[in-house]
Amino acid sequence: MATTRDPLDSSIFLAPLAIDVAKIRSLAHSLCSTFTSLAASSQEQFLPTPISESVLRPDTDGKGRYLAIDIGGTNLRVGFIELLGTPDSSHDATRNGESTHERSRVRRHLEKSWPIGEQLKHNKASDLFAWIGKCIAEVVQNGCLAWPGDLPDEIPLGITFSFPMIQHTLSEATLMSMGKGFQITSNLDLGKLLLEGYEKSRGGTSNLPRIKITAIVNDAVATLVSFAYQFRSTPRRKAAMGLIVGTGCNSTIPLALSKLHPSKRPAKVKVLETETTQEDVKIAVNTEWTIRGAAGPLQELNFITRWDEKLVSEGESPGFQPFEYMTAGRYLGELGRIIILEYLTTNLHIDSSTLPPLLTQRHGVSTTFLGNLGPHLATSEPSLLKQLETGIPALKESGAWRWTQEVAELVYDIAKAIQVRAAGMTAAAVIALLACADEIHFSSAPPPTNAGPLQQHKWHRGSNRRTHGRIYRWLYRPFPGLLDRLSRFSEWDYGC
C-alpha cells in the first residue's frame, strides 16, 4: 500500500522533544534547587544510607570472597565477589569486555543471571523471595563444589536492590513501593524475607552453609561504593556519585548531614574509628530522583510532551516517576511506539488496522530494538528499512501497509530524538546533583537563552580535584548511543 509523506517536516513534528545546551542548563539550575529542597523535606526521596563518605574511601584494602546478589527491575544476579586488594598488573587483561584498569581489584566467580518474569512481579512477596532464595542456593551449591571445604559455615552476603527502601542500619532495610511493574506492597523487611526464602531452599539441613546479611544497599549506592573501591581517591580525583540508567534511572551521592531533614538523619552512621558523626559528615544518599517530587522543573520548562503524558497515563502508577518515564529503558521503547503510531495515523493518515501489529500493541516496540536502530549501530543488518521489516513485521494480508525507506528514516529520527533528550535530561540531573552536593558551583551568570547545542557553558568546581561518576555501562545496552551522548552533554555543560 503506497503512502504519501505529509508536507509537515519531521523536525517540526518532533519539535516538542528538541533540546539544546541552554535548555539543559536551565533544567540543571532548576533541578539543583529542587534537589536541595527534597533533601531537606521529602520522605520518599533523598533517602539516607548509614555509610559515611570516609568509609567509601578507606585507607586500607579490603580482601576476601563474599556472596553478592543484585535484585533489579528486570534481572536477578547472584555470584561470589572476590576483593583482591592492591591491583595486580599481571592479571589477565580482559574479561566480559572490561579492561584491567576497570576490574583489577575485583574478580567475579560463579555468577548467574535470571530474568524476573512478569508473573513473579505480580506474585506475593513470599513467593518472589522464595524464588530468589532458590537461585541463591543454586549458586551457593556451585560454590561448595568449586571450593570444597573452603566456604565458611555462615557466608557473608551483600545485597544490591534496585528499589527505594528505608535504611535503618547497613544490614537492615524496609521496602518502599517498588514500581517497575512490581505489585509488592511497602513496609516489608527485606533481610527477613530474603533469609526466609533461602532457608526454604536450604531445607533446614547442613548441606548448604547459612548466609548472614552484612550489607543491604540500593543499586545506585552500590555503584558508588564499588567505584570508590575500584578507583582510589587521589589529590586530583575522587568518586563523586553513582549513576544508574537501565531499566530504571537513579543516582547516589554523598551529602552532608546538615542538608537532610533531621528525621532523615540515621541514628547511627558507620564512620572510621578516627571520626565522629558531625553535621558536616557526608553520608551516601539514595536520591530516587525520578519520583514525582522532581516533576516541577520538567513541567515549568516544557519538557513533558503529549506523548509523555499518554505514556504516563497508561503506566502502572501514573505520576509516580515522571523523570524515569522520559529517561529509563523500561519506557523509552514504548514512548517511541506512541510517537511512531501518532505520526503514521495522524500525519500520514494510515488506517491503524493495516499497520504492523507491534505498533498497535502496548510495549510492542522494545527499547533495545529502538536503541539499536540505525546503520551506524547495526552489526548484522546495515539496511534501516530491512531492520524495521524484520523487527516490526507488517501484516501478511494483501492491502496491508508496508514500510518504506522514507518512513524508516522518520522512525530513526524519532529514536534519535528520544535518545538525545534522555541523555540531555540525565546530564542536567547529574550536574544539578553535583551542585547540590557542593562538588561544583554554578556561575553567577544567568543561563543563556539562545545558545546552540555545541556552545560550552562551564560551571566552577568546588575544588581543583576532578570529580567522577560511576556508570554501569552494561545497563546502556538497550540504547547503545546513550552513554556517549550523556558524556558529551556533561562535557558541554560542565566543561569537563
Report residues per predicted region:
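ATP-binding/phosphotransfer module of carbohydrate and carboxylate kinases, centering on a glycine-rich
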Residues: 1-109, 120-153, 230, 304-496
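Acidic/polar, low-complexity linker and loop regions
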Residues: 41, 102-110, 207-212, 287-307
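Short, solvent-exposed loop/turn and secondary-structure capping segments
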Residues: 79-81, 90-91, 169-172, 254-256
